[in-house]
Every structure is written in C-alpha cells, then in structure tokens.
Amino acid sequence: MLSKQIPLGIYEKALPAGECWLERLQLAKTLGFDFVEMSVDETDDRLSRLNWSREQRLALVNAIVETGVRVPSMCLSAHRRFPLGSEDDAVRAQGLEIMRKAIQFAQDVGIRVIQLAGYDVYYQEANNETRRRFRDGLKESVEMASRAQVTLAMEIMDYPLMSSISKALGYAHYLNNPWFQLYPDIGNLSAWDNDVQMELQAGIGHIVAVHVKDTKPGVFKNVPFGEGVVDFERCFETLKQSGYCGPYLIEMWSETAEDPAAEVAKARDWVKARMAKAGMVEAA
C-alpha cells in the first residue's frame, strides 16, 4: 500500500556534485528524502546527460531500484541558453531538440514530470515575436510529451512573463492539454507582488509539484530559510486545505558548500517544522 506521507524531495544541486547517482541517492536516503530532482541546465556537462548511452540510463534506473529513492522529476533549465522563443531559427531548433531528447530521456528512466523554465528568451530582449515563438514551441513540445506520456509543468519564474500562477494558467488554457500542468515555486511566487494564497488556490487541479525555497523581492536564489519573505506555514496550510497532496521539493544550491549534507539537513529540519505547524507532518 502506498504511503500517505507527504513526499519530500531534494534538488540535485543541493547535494555534492558528481555523476554517481547511486551515491547521490544513497545520501538523499540517509538524509530522509523520498526523491531527488535531476537538473538538466545550460552547462555542457548536464546537457550531455540527454546523450547518455543505454547503459548509463540503466545505471540510473538500477540506482533508483537499489536505494528506493525515486527520480520522478527533471528541472530543465537548459532553455535559458536555447530558448523556444528565440528569433534565431538555429537556436530555437536546438531548444526543440533539447526538449525532444529530455522527453525521450524521461520516458527511458521513468521521470514523470519535466519542469519547464518560463522564459520566452533569457539573454535577449523579449518582444511580441519571441512570445509568439515561445507559445508555438510549447505547443510543439506538449504534442511530443503527449505521445510519450510525460508531463510538462511550468515553473513560476523570476521573470515577468511567468511571475504568477494566473499567468501560467493562461498557457494551460491556451494549450488545453492534460500533459501540460503547473509546478509553482512558492519562493518565486512570494517575491513578486502576488496574493500568494489566492494564486495557490487558483492553481489547484493543475499543480503537480511545489518548489520550496525562500526569497526576497528581487533576490530569487540562495536566501537562507527564514531570512526571506515567504510565509511558509500559510502556504502549506493553503495547499493542504485546497486538497493538494502532491510532492514538495526543497530547492537549494549547496553543492559547492563546505558540507552540503549539513546544509541540507538544516534546511530539511526547518521546512519540516513549518510543515508540522501547518498540520502536514507530525512534529519531530
């Protein structure tokens, strides 16, 4: 029988860097996490994962089976470098090819959700044409994902185009496809001028996972838990009362810290204490 516990995961970039997934999943298990979210970012190293051999993919699957720690989601931020809204046809084609490979990779190793970065372009100036190309690129991507039975889920971003659940829902309604859903980040959502609780309620029925991090206005990364503006307890209460039962993912970038495991354990305890206050988990 499946556990009724809230699934709590950790972002790959919170754990020590390296390519040994057995070691990474063993550490995540030791730290008490149910799953790890893989990163495929714009660096050549992480992008190269999409070209893994059959044997490399099988090694990841075997590590999951051996440890019991799942890898159910991928954070696909490579589209910052190869955006779907690019006005350069070659760059945009690369972006679509990355999407195709990511969906195939997910299908091969059992990843269910690919979190998308909501940028039409990142390093260039946005305009109506970049937004149109982005929409068309999403439509093509969701068609690929539908055939593979892999969910694409839009993150709420550090970028005006996708700064709220309401904006992301506009794309969900435009695409009108069950394989396109939302993956909000309560940190990013709180850093903008949003009614956070109303936004979370509006997304219920489309939210497939939740990123957990702290932020400040204009500061979207590396804000220690408890030092930002996020009202975690209230967010957790809203999600619980709205009927959300899905996974939560602690997002951190401590892979280069002196002791990443200690940083992660501290964050885990802090987050679980807020979850306990919200009645989601038992107090430690």
Curated annotation (Swiss-Prot):
Enzyme class: isomerase
Listed InterPro entries: L-Ru-5P_3-Epase (IPR004560), L-Ru-5P_3-Epase_Enterobacteria (IPR023492), Sugar_Epim/Isomerase (IPR050417), Xyl_isomerase-like_sf (IPR036237), Xyl_isomerase-like_TIM-brl (IPR013022)
Catalytic activity: L-ribulose 5-phosphate = L-xylulose 5-phosphate
GO molecular function: intramolecular oxidoreductase activity, interconverting aldoses and ketoses; L-ribulose-5-phosphate 3-epimerase activity
Listed EC numbers: 5.1.3.22
Keyword Transmembrane in record: no
GO biological process, one term: L-ascorbic acid catabolic process
Inducing stimuli: Induced by L-ascorbate. Repressed by UlaR.
Pathway(s) of this molecule: Cofactor degradation; L-ascorbate degradation; D-xylulose 5-phosphate from L-ascorbate: step 3/4
Keywords of the record: Isomerase
Keyword Lyase part of the UniProt annotation: no
Family of the protein in this entry: Belongs to the L-ribulose-5-phosphate 3-epimerase family.
UniProt xrefs under HAMAP family: UlaE
NCBIfam families reported in the protein's UniProt record: hxl6Piso_put, PRK13209.1, PRK13210.1
Described function: Catalyzes the isomerization of L-xylulose-5-phosphate to L-ribulose-5-phosphate. Is involved in the anaerobic L-ascorbate utilization.
UniProt-recorded name of the protein: L-ribulose-5-phosphate 3-epimerase UlaE
Originating species: Escherichia coli (strain K12)
Gene: ulaE
